[in-house]
Swiss-Prot record:
Belongs to the UPF0597 family. GO terms for biological process: L-cysteine catabolic process to pyruvate. Signal peptide: none annotated. One of its GO terms (molecular function) is L-cysteine desulfhydrase activity. This is UPF0597 protein Shewmr4_2793. InterPro entries: Ser_deHydtase-like_asu, UPF0597. It comes from Shewanella sp. (strain MR-4).
């Protein structure tokens, strides 16, 4: 296999992985669980410091297995019951009794959460104290990327430069672009990418959960009721929007099921997966072609998002859905050129969507971007595309660079304003 393709598979394995619950509070749970492995006794108090952006994405989302919202319960549950070996599934086996114990610690004022100034978008430092003993774990640059461990002030671990590489830079130094992703997805041996079908399995289960039970705003179930009432039809567009939103409903509503995430985001993993799966069903393609389309969607999303920092003011579901739309064109038998049209169309359609934290209404944003993906892939199949208008360049690679510039140079103050509004 080509060395370049091996790099692509390594990238996917690194950042497309199961995650139980919204990844920002789960980062605190994971840090707390790792810190607990250093402390010889159960903690009596917990201190959590996080970046503004991690704070923003933890304020309104349920922590799975707890039925509660926020960083305090995430850190307390992680410290008292988390599995430090489970990564983003750290809280998979938390019991109601352990949640009660964690809440007791919070009610006693023993769990403190505060924002801290840092240049990192993803930053979390958790300190556990018991008597005179203290264990500290610092996460920086990625949701499970441990930068430092200390016990009683003594450094016991520090990440080397390679380990400390931020997820936003994951494609640095790698020969990658939309065309190389497209060719890779088409030509790589099936057995090398068969693992990506796990994304279909996990995220489809979340969708089923969101359709069968009331989570969050019930965006998916509301659409189902509309179909049953004859108000809207069960066509491809509505089916994709309904089932994608349902998975996000369950995800943000605290369902105790993992999502296959994409670059640290469960919702974006859902947005990269469900529209592709439903389109594959519509066109009755083989399992192999579905796997190739999922690779195209997930790696395409990773590549586009590598042009700007994680947890910015820009909602990443937009560009994730652009990559999904590219894969949908492929499933429908379209050309590479038409796949590029799909990316251009989605970004033109919904690139103004901002991120104001992780919460139940993220399911609405997922539904919006997924709807854009369907419209855009249908337009692309008719060779209709946005080109040379606004931030959309004539070339898809230039458009992607423009998105990076817009977020990096134009949305920093937007991010600060959003966080300040949310903190009022």
């Amino acid at each position: 296999m080509k060395p370049q393709w091996q790099q692509y598979i390594q990238i996917i394995n690194q950042v497309v992985k199961p995650a139980l619950g919204c990844t920002e509070p789960i980062a605190a749970a994971y840090a707390a669980a790792v810190a607990r492995t250093l402390l010889p006794v159960e903690p009596e108090s917990i201190a959590v410091q996080v970046s503004d952006n991690l704070y923003k994405n933890s304020m309104g989302v349920y922590v799975p297995g707890t039925g509660k919202i926020g960083l305090a319960i995430a850190a307390a549950a992680g410290a008292l019951a988390g599995d430090a070996e489970a990564g983003l599934e750290v809280l998979a086996n938390v019991t109601p009794e352990q949640v009660t114990k964690a809440q007791t610690l919070i009610d006693a004022g023993k769990v403190k959460v505060e924002r801290t100034e840092t240049d990192e978008f993803i930053y979390c430092c958790v300190s556990l104290t018991a008597g005179e003993q203290e264990a500290m774990v610092k996460i920086c640059g990625g949701h499970t990327l441990i930068a430092e461990k200390r016990l009683n002030g003594e450094l016991v671990f520090t990440a080397d430069n390679a380990q400390a590489k931020a997820t936003g830079s994951i494609c640095d130094g790698i020969d990658i672009n939309i065309e190389s992703i497209y060719r890779f997805a088409q030509e790589v041996p099936f057995e090398e990418i068969q693992f990506i079908l796990k994304a279909s399995e996990l995220n489809s289960k979340l969708s089923d959960e969101g359709m069968s039970k009331p989570y969050g705003l019930e965006v998916g179930r509301t659409m189902k009721n509309g179909i049953a009432a004859g108000i809207i039809g069960e066509d491809l567009l509505n089916k994709i929007v309904m089932l994608t939103a349902a998975a996000s409903d369950a995800r943000m509503g605290g369902a105790n099921l993992p999502a296959m995430s994409n670059l640290g985001s469960g919702n974006q993993g859902i947005a990269a997966t469900i529209p592709v799966v439903i389109t594959a069903q519509c066109y009755k393609v083989s399992e192999e072609k579905l796997a190739r389309a999922l690779i195209m969607s997930h790696l395409g999303a990773i590549y586009i998002k590598s042009h700007y920092p994680p947890l910015s003011a820009f909602c990443g579901n937009t560009v994730t859905s652009a990559a999904a739309s590219m894969a949908m064109v492929y499933l429908a038998g379209g050309s590479f050129e038409q796949s590029c049209y799909a990316i251009q169309n989605v970004i033109s359609d919904s690139s103004g969507m901002v991120c104001d934290g992780a919460k139940a209404s993220c399911a609405m944003k997922v539904s919006t971007s997924s709807s854009a993906a369907v419209r855009s892939f249908l337009m692309a199949l008719s060779s209709q595309n946005v080109s040379g208008q606004g931030i959309i360049a004539k070339d898809v690679e230039k458009t992607i660079k423009n998105i990076g510039k817009m977020v990096l140079n134009g949305m920093s103050s937007t991010d600060v304003t959003i966080i300040n509004i949310m903190s009022e």
